[in-house]
């Protein structure tokens, strides 16, 4: 996949959520502007995608939209085309539908509360090779606990410290052909959109093995505060 393949994408960032589990931060800020290591979560996401080669962004806002609009006006993104769309208090799919009126070609749909150093070139290559209408980035679930293995006599045979489980979770970074967006329906939500594509056999998975965190709670935010430095390393203008 060439660099042009990535630069031709439009990234749709879903940043309209209230983030009720992140209070008191979200009493005065939208979830996407919750600080991580001195910068808003949205700043980290925009920087990573920009460094990876994405040049056009649509930021979908709702809760405390004016705060995000102000951040984008003051942000240092002169070489990037950033459009802000305020749909109010609606579902994610309605936000995407309002966004696609402003784009042509492929889109990359990202959750505004999720950081991951996804290799967009590899995602694009997997998407092209599969012939999918949409490719969803997935992440292997890890047990938060150490696992004990024992035999029928209850004799302990081994331990696994927080092992990887045989399950994969949806972390966004959803690469869509224009035809995939026909599965969107107003008033529905993301699970229905994804399930409709899965039922039609046009949705494929991309396995992300790098860094990932979704910031839903203060515990998540505190963990991300220490990990975000490791997430994104910038070398020679490329995201690693």
Regions found by a protein language model. Name each.
Residues 33, 148-150, 205:
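A structural signal for short hydrophobic beta-strand segments in well-ordered beta-sheet cores
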């Amino acid at each position: 996949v060439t660099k042009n393949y990535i630069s031709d994408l439009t990234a749709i960032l879903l940043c309209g959520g209230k983030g009720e589990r992140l209070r008191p931060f979200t009493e005065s800020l939208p979830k996407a502007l919750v600080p991580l290591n001195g910068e808003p979560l949205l700043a980290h996401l925009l920087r990573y995608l920009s460094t990876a080669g994405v040049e056009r962004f649509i930021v979908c806002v709702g809760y405390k939209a004016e705060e995000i609009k102000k951040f984008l006006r003051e942000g240092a993104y002169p070489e990037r085309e950033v459009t802000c769309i305020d749909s109010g208090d609606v579902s994610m799919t309605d936000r995407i539908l309002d966004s696609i009126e402003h784009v042509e070609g492929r889109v990359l749909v990202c959750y505004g509360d999720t950081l991951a150093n996804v290799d967009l070139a590899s995602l694009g290559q997997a998407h092209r090779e599969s012939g999918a209408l949409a490719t969803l980035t997935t992440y292997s679930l890890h047990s938060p606990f150490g696992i004990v293995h024992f035999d029928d006599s209850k004799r302990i045979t081994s331990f696994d410290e927080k092992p990887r489980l045989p399950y994969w979770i949806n972390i966004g970074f959803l690469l869509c052909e224009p035809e995939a967006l026909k599965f969107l329906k107003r008033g529905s939500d993301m699970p229905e959109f994804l399930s409709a594509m899965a039922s039609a056999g046009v949705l494929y998975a991309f396995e992300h093995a790098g860094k990932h965190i979704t910031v839903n709670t203060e515990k998540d935010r505190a963990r991300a505060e220490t990990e975000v430095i490791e997430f994104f390393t910038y070398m020679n203008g490329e995201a690693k």
